Structure formats: C-alpha cells, structure tokens
Amino acid sequence: MAIGVIHVTQNGNRNKMTLKTPASWHRDMWREGLPAGNGKIGALVYGNIADETIVINHCKLWHWGKRNELPDIHEALSETRKQLDKGNFWDANTISADLLKKKGYTARLASPCPLCDIKVIMDSKNAFHHYRRVLNMETGEVCVSWKEEDCEFTRKLFVSRADDMLVYKLTSNQRHLNANLFLQLHETYDKDTKKMREEQGSNLVEYADKNFIYYSARNEDGRDFGAVMKIVGDGDLATQDGRSISVKNGNEITVYCCFFVGGQRNTEFEKYKRKLEGWNDTYEACLKRHAKLHGALFHNVDIQIADQDLDKSNEELLFNAYEQTASNALIERMWRFGRYLMISGTAENGLPFPLYGLWPGKYRLPWSHNMANENIQMIYWHTMVGGLEYTMKTVLDYYWSLMDDFRQNARRLFGCSGIYIPAGTTPGMGYPNQIVPVILNWIGAAGWLCQHFYDYYKFTGDEEFLKEKILPFMYEAAQFYSDYIVMDEKGNCKIYPSVSPENTPKSLMPGDEYEHMAHPCPSAVNATMDFAIVKELFRNIIEASKITGMYQDKIKSWETILKAIPEYQKNADGDIKEWMHPDLTDRYTHRHLSHIYPVFPGKEYVIGRDDMDMPVGFELAVSKRTPDSQSGWSLAHMACIYARLEKPEKAIRCLDILTRSCVLKNLFTLHNDWRKMGLTLDGGESVPVQMDANMGIANAVQEMLLFVSDDFIKILPACPERFKKGAVKNLHFMTGLISFKWDILAGYFVCNIASLRNTRLTIQLPKFFHRYAMNGHSIDGRTPGIALKAGERLCITAQTDKEEEETNLA
C-alpha cells in the first residue's frame, strides 16, 4: 500500500553506484568486488578486463565445521558462583571453559564455502580507457565496461530471483569479442586453496561439452555442489583443453548458469542441462522478470536527502569524505546499498544474512558465522521500519531449527530449563563452539533475539505466527532466565556470571599496559545489559501472553522477577555503570556499547516520553568511549544511540568517521581501519570485511529521520544540520506507513500517514516548524495524538503565517 501524495524524485543515478577502477586489493580482490544476488546465490564481480573472476556462493554451502556431543558440566555453575561470591573473579572466569576442554569437547563452527569461480579470459590488444564498473541497485545488475580505441566492450550480469540462475552477457560493438570461459574451484592466495584441492582430489570435475561447461566438487557430508553453464552467441564457439569454451570474433554472447548444493552431480548435471537446453529467453527478458521482483522490494521504501553529487563515483565520494565529512550523496548511497545487500543476500526460506553476506572470498574467514552478541542484531535493525519485515521470519526459522541444541545447552551447561543460545552459530550447529569465557558465560543472546521476533509480530500483526513460534521461543528464553537468576540478600535479582559483551571491568584488568587486551576477565556480576534484556523480555512476554491467552500460569512469576530487577546505577561521574556491582568499575577503551541497551536498541527510555535524568547518564557513558577503541560496526551502533538521544550532530559525526576509516570503494564496510590512522582500534594484520556496519548505517539514517515505538513516533528527531531538505516514502511504523517531505529553509513540511491496522499513537512533529495542521485544521503544539481505523489516512502540514490565517477564517 503506497501513500500517493508524497512524491520522491526517481532519478536513476540515485540507485546506481559507479566505480572508475576494478577491484584492486592485492591478493584479496574479492574485498572490492561488486555484489549481485537473489537471496540464495551470490555473485561477486572483480571487474578485471583481461582476467575476470566472478566468485559464486550459495547460502547453504558451508564446510569445515566440527560437531561433537556436548558434555554435562552444569556443576561448574555453582563453583563459578562460589568464586564470584568470594570476589575471586579471575578464578571464576575460566571454570566452565576449562571443564569443557578437560572433557574433550572440541566443537568448531563451519565457514561459508565459495562454490566456484566463473572465469573470463579476454584478449586486450589495445590499452583500455573510459573504464567503469556500475551496480544498479534497483535491478541488481552489475556492469563492467571500457573502450579500446573506438571499440566498446560491456560485460553485465545479474542473479535472477525469477529463474534462479545467473545470466551474463558480453558484448562488443565491432565483432572483436574474443574470450575464453570456464568454471573452476575458487582460487585464493591462501593455503586454504591448496587444502581444498587436496581434499577434493578426483572428486573435482571440470569439463566442457559442445556449448556447455560442467563443474562439481564434493563437500564433507559426501554430497556434491557445482554448476552447469550454457553459452550462446554469434561468434565462433569451440571447446578448449576439455574444460573451457572459446569465443572468437563475436558481437555478443550470453551465458546462463545454474548452481546446485547437495545431491549427486550426475543427477544435477542432467537436470540443469535439460533446463538450459530448452532455455531460449534473452538476457533482457530474464532481466525484466528478475527486476520486477527485486525492484518491488527495493522500492517499497525510499529516502532522499541528497540533491547534488548523485552522479559522482564511489571513489570521488569517499575521497571527499576522507577530507572532512561525508556528503549527503554518500550517506544516501550507503543507506541504499545497505538495503540492496539485505535484499540480495537473504530470502524467504533461505538463511539469515551472515557477516559477509553471500560474498565471502575465502574458505576460512574470521567471524563468518552468525554472531548474536551484536552483529546479527545490527544486520536486521533497519528491516522493520525499512519495510523488509519478511527477512526476520528467516532468522526465527533458523534459530527455531536449532532449538534441540539450545535446550541441551541450558541443561548441560547450567542445569537450567529453557534455552541457552551461544553467541556464534552456523547452520546445523547450535552447541557452544567458541570455548572461551567471554562467549561461553554470556547469556543474553536468546533474550536479545526475542526483541527482534516480537517486533516482527508488532509490525505485521501476525498473531498466528506469534502463537506458533514467536511466543513459544520467548517462553523458552524466559524459562532459562527464571532458573538462572538468583535473589540476593536484599531480595533483588542477581545475575552471575554475567558478561557485558566482550568487555572486562577496569578493576579486573591486569594493568594499564594491557588496556587494549581483548577480554582478559569478562565473567562478572550484574551486567547492566543482562538486566535490560531480561526486563524487556519479561514485559513483552507478559503482554504477548495476555494477547494470546497462553502461559497464563506463568505471568505472576514473571511479574515477581520484574519487580525484583534493581534500578540502573550510575558511577561517581554520573554515567550509567556497565556492571551493577560496587567492585566493578567502568572501562571506556572498548568498542561494545552493551550497557546503553535501555536507550538503544531497547526503548525503555525514550527522549520526550520518559524520565529525562536517566538518558543523560547513558549519553555520558557513550561519550567516554575512546575513539581508538572503536570499529566500523561500533561507530554505526554509536550513531544509532546518538540518534535515539536526539543528538544529530554527534550521530552524523560517527558516520563521518566511519566513511573516512572503514569503507572500501565498493562500499563494503570493514571491522577496522587498515591504514592505522587512529580512528579505530588497531586490528593488526586482520582487517575483516563485516557487513553489519553496512546495515547499521542504514538503520542510523532511518533513526535520524524517524523514531518508532508502539504508541509514540517522532519525525526528524535527530535530523542533522546538513539534511536541510529531503523526502521519505513509506517508512513503516507498527500499524501503518508514513511518508513526509521537508525543506527547513523554505519552511515546508508535509506528512501523510496511512493506517494499515487500527492505530492509536502520539506523534512528535519536527521542531523546525512551529504551526501545524492535520487534514487542514490547525493544532496546538507538536505532539498530537491520533486515532485511525484500518485504511484511514491523515495529512499533516506545516503552515506559513498566511496559511494559518486562512485556516482560522475557514
């Protein structure tokens, strides 16, 4: 359902990003490739003229994991607590991890496995000029083009949602198309490529037959993965060396490629050969079908804050950001790119979007799993307000598939009922696998994920799914916390061991010289984040139980726990404490911002709705985080926090620093600045691509423009000074859609609200305008309450002096 009154300019340049250079990170070209995908299959285009590589990944292809039986070590919890009660934090820290290792537990997370490379070797007889790489985000098409003297070459591809295949077209305007195409095991400069080849041995198959190329390898489970490629064109086609197809003197060739994961290669080869033999649709016809599906998702929401520099290349925009500040054009492009990645990188009935999306370029990358102590949450923050609610169902289905593992975790690690979710998981692996205290002793994952799942219900109103999966999941999480929490001598809840991800209290650090040590002693008592998560979960599950009539016998016990949760504490400087314990002091040289949870990503304290004293303490706590301890994702997180605190210039400054330090020319975000310029932590030789920051930026932009909660929304709550005008189309609140357009210098504001379900809420209108009218009638103040039935609409405008006079006369 679209709101028709607010129109946004459909300038094609807004949805295209242009690069003037190919991927060029030495020995790691994949980092700067351009991504295409249909939510299940990903293609990453390097853009090299003479020796092109397109890396193919499939969401269900993982390898090199290890699963073994989880031993029962629940007795370790009581011993850990004994040591914590004595103040022996260091002794308590490793008890559980050491016992697991002693009992021989050696689980290991799997990693995404690149499926293959599509290789294109081309003659290059003359020096190139006018080189471009272009990603069209509204269609999902990647195009590489260049000229050699007066001859023009283009190579373009997309991964079809409609037909579940990659379609690739190569053209030359002078019949100078000479190319050799083949499929191969993905090549890297890592020793892992050699390991893969040795593991495959005779299982690796690559051959060409007529105009078809076949490729297959075998995974650890004994099942095959591979590809079948068909090539058609007007040049001279011939097989070469038994594994490739050459094209001579062509104007145009089209490549159709299907991929499989699982099954048996000969069966899959025959299946896809039959499919492609009868395939006669042109590239353009296939693109039209795909673009219709892709575009419907991409365009269901829009944000425009830029009116210049829209045609500048990524390199130009990033260079300008490096000089001082990110332009509106770059911020808007980053927002669009975050949405594009999400739409292209995950799908219904697929798997959650991992940290590398569908575009990993190595066989064993750091943090390539689904990490739930920050990262997967950040990846999905933007989806509800951004109109991509469907993606959350995939996340819940993924975690639901691991429930048996999670129940065993709770019993065998802690002697508790319900579920314990380890921070890191991969498909089919829900047991703990990072056997270190900072991960093993953190209990917040299940509760934090419940926030996302319950938001899915609130934004969709899907009560059937609430009853079927969301509320049962919340119930199991609540059962665990009910068992895990103890009462102290004052009758307050006590949570221990309790980890504030991945931080260690300053008072437990071994010395100032170890200030940047990763996490020496994180197992503490009463982390603020744990209380915030438990409080939010129990409030939500009580509400959901009353809506559905389920779990009525548990409500009283949940209410008892809620009443016993202590108030958040402040330290001597007035900032919120990260650990609510007298012996644990705050450590500011850290990237995680977990104790700010009640402000963001939670909504326990909202500026303009709640006690103003508490948010000041949260702001102080954020402001003391040191710049040289941050990462790409933490800067995005910090921007979201400052937006919630209505500090727009601080929020946009975080994005300025992020784009200056942790963004590659293809707009992939990094964990840390590889150039060591003092804007982030020093990651040493490790500079991982992490797309959580891509999504975090998308969310930060949305948070600046719109705050949404159950019964209170704010328009332009943290609009930075540089966003003087702009337009928003169809952002989502929980029961409807909102579109608005503003021009601060012109005194112009118009907002349209469409109620999809019965709506009752308060709106905080922008502070930049002072006289408002609803449906043409003047209103007092800027926080009106509204009540709309499903299907009703409301128009709010800012009035000039003349308009107000005319309204009053009427």
Indicate residue ranges for each PLM-predicted region.
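C-terminal capping/lid segments that line or modulate ligand- or cofactor-binding pockets
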Residues: 33-55, 60-61, 99, 114, ...
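Asparagine-centered strand-capping/turn motif at beta-strand->loop junctions
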Residues: 753-757
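Short, well-structured active-site flanking segments
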Residues: 347-356, 392-393, 460-467, 476, ...
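Core alpha/beta catalytic barrel or barrel-like domain that forms the active/cofactor pocket
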Residues: 412-414, 442-455, 491-499
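Non-membrane alpha-helical structural segments and their capping/turn regions in soluble enzymes
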Residues: 284, 328, 332, 447, ...
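Aromatic-residue-lined binding/catalytic grooves and analogous aromatic/hydrophobic interfacial grooves
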Residues: 4-437, 444, 455-457, 475-478, ...
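Extended, hydrophobic alpha-helical segments in both membrane/secreted and soluble proteins
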Residues: 442-456, 469-483, 634, 651, ...
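Hydrophobic alpha-helical bundle architecture
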Residues: 458-472, 479, 683, 687-690
